[in-house]
């Protein structure tokens, strides 16, 4: 009993669970219900992220579709950032901050508030890692938005954006950057970001097949 109690009161366990719960806040679902009376989990792809929200609202001729989708994207991004910020604020070890980041991503994709359904997690991924690897993630964000703006294919932009940040972690740590944002100095491995990228690919398997077949839908 004491072992269980010690486990449940362990600061690292508490913040990992907190990261999961924060990441699990379904902003897309909540805002679509509040403002439009729609259950976004039962429409389109069933995802609660900005892409499915945008497609759903545009298909119904809603004039502020882009603004609502952008709001949801920002909220999903900032919840990941907030979870990691809290872990930094309370002085958690850098490797455990990565655990909190991963927990927030899993929370978004498998929300405890939606029977463990959710979105594909890209906004939350970018938000959660920006305080951990700011150089790599900010460049990844720019690539994500650029590809999305030019090609208007959300899934491709997501994969390329997260992929860019992942590739950069094999180069940026060897530059003259502060140890506090150097994944190799703090963790000793690039594994956390590589796992996140693999998870991104898994969540986009259907989209990848559609891309290869030339059937992936564009976001207008």
UniProtKB/Swiss-Prot annotation:
The keyword Phosphoprotein does not apply. Pfam families: G3P_acyltransf. Its main location: membrane. Its EC number is 2.3.1.275. Keywords: Cell inner membrane, Cell membrane, Lipid biosynthesis, Lipid metabolism, Membrane, Phospholipid biosynthesis, Phospholipid metabolism, Transferase, Transmembrane, Transmembrane helix. GO terms for biological process: phospholipid biosynthetic process. Pathway: Lipid metabolism; phospholipid metabolism. It is a multi-pass membrane protein. The chain crosses the membrane at residues 11-31, 70-90, 96-116, 127-147, 153-173, 193-213. One of its GO terms (cellular component) is plasma membrane. It catalyses: an acyl phosphate + sn-glycerol 3-phosphate = a 1-acyl-sn-glycero-3-phosphate + phosphate. Catalyzes the transfer of an acyl group from acyl-phosphate (acyl-PO(4)) to glycerol-3-phosphate (G3P) to form lysophosphatidic acid (LPA). This enzyme utilizes acyl-phosphate as fatty acyl donor, but not acyl-CoA or acyl-ACP. Belongs to the PlsY family. PANTHER family: GLYCEROL-3-PHOSPHATE ACYLTRANSFERASE-RELATED, INNER MEMBRANE PROTEIN YGIH. This is Glycerol-3-phosphate acyltransferase. It comes from Helicobacter acinonychis (strain Sheeba). The lineage of its organism: Bacteria, Pseudomonadati, Campylobacterota, Epsilonproteobacteria, Campylobacterales. The gene is plsY.
């Amino acid at each position: 009993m004491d072992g269980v109690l010690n486990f449940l009161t362990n600061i690292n366990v508490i913040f990992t669970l907190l990261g999961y719960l924060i990441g699990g806040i379904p902003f897309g679902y909540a805002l679509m219900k509040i403002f439009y009376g729609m259950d976004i989990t039962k429409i389109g792809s069933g995802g609660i992220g900005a892409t499915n929200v945008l497609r759903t609202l545009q298909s119904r001729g809603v004039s502020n579709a882009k603004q609502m989708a952008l709001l949801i994207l920002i909220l999903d991004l900032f919840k990941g950032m907030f979870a990691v910020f809290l872990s930094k604020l309370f002085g958690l070890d850098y490797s455990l901050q990565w655990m909190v980041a991963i927990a927030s991503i899993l929370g978004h994709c498998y929300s405890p508030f939606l029977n463990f359904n959710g979105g594909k997690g890209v906004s939350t991924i970018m938000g959660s890692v920006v305080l951990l690897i700011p150089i790599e993630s900010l460049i990844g964000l720019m690539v994500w938005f650029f590809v999305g703006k030019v090609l208007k294919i959300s899934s491709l932009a997501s994969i390329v954006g997260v992929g860019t940040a992942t590739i950069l972690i094999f180069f940026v740590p060897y530059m003259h950057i502060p140890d506090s944002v150097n994944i190799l100095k703090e963790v000793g491995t690039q594994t956390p970001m590589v796992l996140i990228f693999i998870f991104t690919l898994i969540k986009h398997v259907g989209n990848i097949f559609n891309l290869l077949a030339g059937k992936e839908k564009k976001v207008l």
